């Protein structure tokens, strides 16, 4: 298929998305609808996302069937869709052009002269959201594509003008190599997605290829605190901007850091050791200072004023599933977080600990068998800042259970490291356990990239709390 004609509504009038209920796919569907395409899509189950798309005029099919693609001129699919999917298989047998999600996102990015791609093992969604709010405060009218729901834009996608585009850039299966960034942010590089990558060197090489996509007049915004990030900056022929909390050589840094009773950080921003402004964040944790510095560096390079940068960051109150307050029952606060990598867990729990709760209860749902198996030792040491860990069954996502790893093993490993941990397989049992044991003033965190957030929702719905003496 001719790549330049992908976004021509005269050539491909009807685009069908397999897995349209996914956070990225739904956003891309909205963008194509806005560009004048007829859009349809299918998913295995209906959701709030698919309902929202239907209201916008997108035809949604529940379940996958050959019939769903009968009018399609182009079929878009995700990495999670297998080759034997009936819709994908039928499209190929009929000669209907097919396209993976990352290629489509890259082609959309091509349309914008100033495209920002935010990469890193952790912090992508938060940083993309921060950058988006700063650009909105700066009246740049960006088109935004986020891997989470941001209340300020009413979801995960915003259609703006044809100049600025902001999106996350995920390294899984090297999909970000299909992007066309003018400015690339690299927040950190750690071992993850080991069902695809061989080792950390393989991952670093993918990030190196990614930042080499930036043109000579473009920018790479890189974390100077991360040695893996620093190691790939050699032989990159574009403007390099660094940020960091612990590196004296970073261009953008922070000092006078303090935290209020909610764990929200206040700090002074420095550029080349010169004090620029003071920021008061409305999200907890020192890791969010680093995300804020990355956002400041990126937006300043794009010409945003310090005044608008400050306004944007101070208006950011978080996104859904990132330390999201779900509710309070019997003076027990329930928070949900997307953390599913050891470093993310550590950062989230460190932020939670700064809130001075009597006890922190962490309900963790491991995400994928390969990640749990390969990072088992790191996971077992990641819960130092919680009082009790409840491990539920592994969320398989795209994988099959080979029997090599189980949540019981992780719970045992955590106990071996001196932490109080138990394995409870079902959500109902976890809710009953929390009702009997959590006390007023405590914090409950549901944590993981699957559906563990339902535990918190079930806990809050059940008003029959058991009194704890």
Curated annotation (Swiss-Prot):
Alphabetized GO MF terms: ATP binding; UDP-N-acetylmuramate-L-alanine ligase activity
Residues noted as binding ATP in the record, renumbered to the chain: 120-126
Major location (coarse): cytoplasm
Record flagged with keyword Cytoplasm: yes
Compartments, as annotated in UniProt: Cytoplasm
EC number assigned by the record: 6.3.2.8
A Pfam family it matches: Mur_ligase_M
Domain of life: Bacteria
Alphabetical keyword list: ATP-binding, Cell cycle, Cell division, Cell shape, Cell wall biogenesis/degradation, Cytoplasm, Ligase, Nucleotide-binding, Peptidoglycan synthesis
Gene Ontology CC entries for this record: cytoplasm
Annotated GO biological process: cell division; cell wall organization; peptidoglycan biosynthetic process; regulation of cell shape
Pathway: Cell wall biogenesis; peptidoglycan biosynthesis
Reactions that this protein is recorded to catalyse: UDP-N-acetyl-alpha-D-muramate + L-alanine + ATP = UDP-N-acetyl-alpha-D-muramoyl-L-alanine + ADP + phosphate + H(+)
EC top class, as a word: ligase
Function: Cell wall formation.
Family designation: Belongs to the MurCDEF family.
Record's protein name: UDP-N-acetylmuramate--L-alanine ligase
């Amino acid at each position: 298929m001719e790549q330049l004609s992908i976004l021509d509504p005269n050539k491909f009038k009807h685009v069908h998305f397999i897995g349209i209920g996914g956070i990225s796919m739904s956003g891309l569907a909205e963008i194509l609808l806005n560009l004048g395409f007829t859009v349809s899509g299918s998913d295995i189950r209906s959701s709030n996302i698919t309902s929202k798309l239907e209201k916008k005029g997108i035809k949604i099919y529940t379940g996958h069937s050959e019939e769903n693609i009968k009018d399609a001129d182009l079929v878009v699919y995700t990495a999670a869709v297998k080759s034997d999917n009936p819709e994908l298989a039928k499209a190929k047998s009929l000669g209907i052009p097919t396209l993976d999600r990352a290629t489509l996102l890259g082609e959309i990015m091509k349309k914008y002269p100033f495209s920002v791609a935010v990469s890193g093992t952790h912090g992508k969604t938060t940083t993309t959201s921060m950058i988006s709010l700063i650009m909105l405060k700066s009246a740049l009218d960006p088109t935004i594509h986020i891997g989470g729901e941001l209340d300020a834009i009413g979801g995960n996608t915003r259609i703006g003008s044809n100049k600025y585009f902001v999106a996350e850039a995920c390294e899984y299966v090297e999909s970000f190599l299909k992007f066309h960034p003018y400015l690339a942010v690299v927040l950190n590089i750690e071992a993850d997605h080991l069902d695809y990558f061989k080792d950390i060197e393989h991952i670093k090489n993918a990030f190196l290829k990614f930042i080499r996509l930036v043109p000579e007049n473009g920018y790479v915004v890189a974390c100077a605190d991360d040695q893996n990030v620093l190691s790939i900056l050699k032989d990159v022929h574009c403007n390099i901007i660094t940020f960091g909390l612990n590196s004296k050589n970073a261009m953008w840094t922070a000092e006078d850091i303090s935290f209020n009773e909610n764990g929200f950080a206040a700090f002074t921003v420095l550029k080349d050791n010169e004090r620029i402004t003071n920021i008061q964040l409305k999200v907890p944790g020192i890791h969010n200072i680093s995300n804020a510095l990355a956002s400041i560096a990126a937006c300043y390079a794009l010409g945003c004023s310090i005044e608008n940068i400050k306004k944007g960051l101070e208006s950011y109150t978080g996104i859904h599933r990132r330390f999201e307050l779900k509710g309070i029952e019997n003076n027990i606060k329930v928070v949900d977080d997307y953390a599913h990598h050891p470093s993310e867990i550590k950062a989230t729990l460190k932020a939670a600990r700064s809130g001075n709760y009597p006890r922190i209860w962490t309900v963790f749902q491991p995400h994928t068998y390969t990640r749990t198996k390969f990072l088992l030792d790191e996971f077992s040491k990641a819960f130092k800042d919680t009082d009790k860990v409840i491990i539920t069954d592994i969320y398989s996502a795209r994988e099959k259970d080979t029997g090599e790893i189980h949540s019981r093993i992780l719970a045992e490993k955590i106990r071996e490291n001196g932490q109080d941990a138990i394995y409870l397989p079902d959500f109902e049992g976890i809710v009953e356990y929390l009702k009997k044991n959590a006390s007023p003033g405590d914090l409950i965190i549901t944590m993981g990239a699957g559906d563990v957030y339902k535990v918190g929702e079930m806990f809050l719905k059940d008003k029959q709390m058991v009194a704890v003496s």
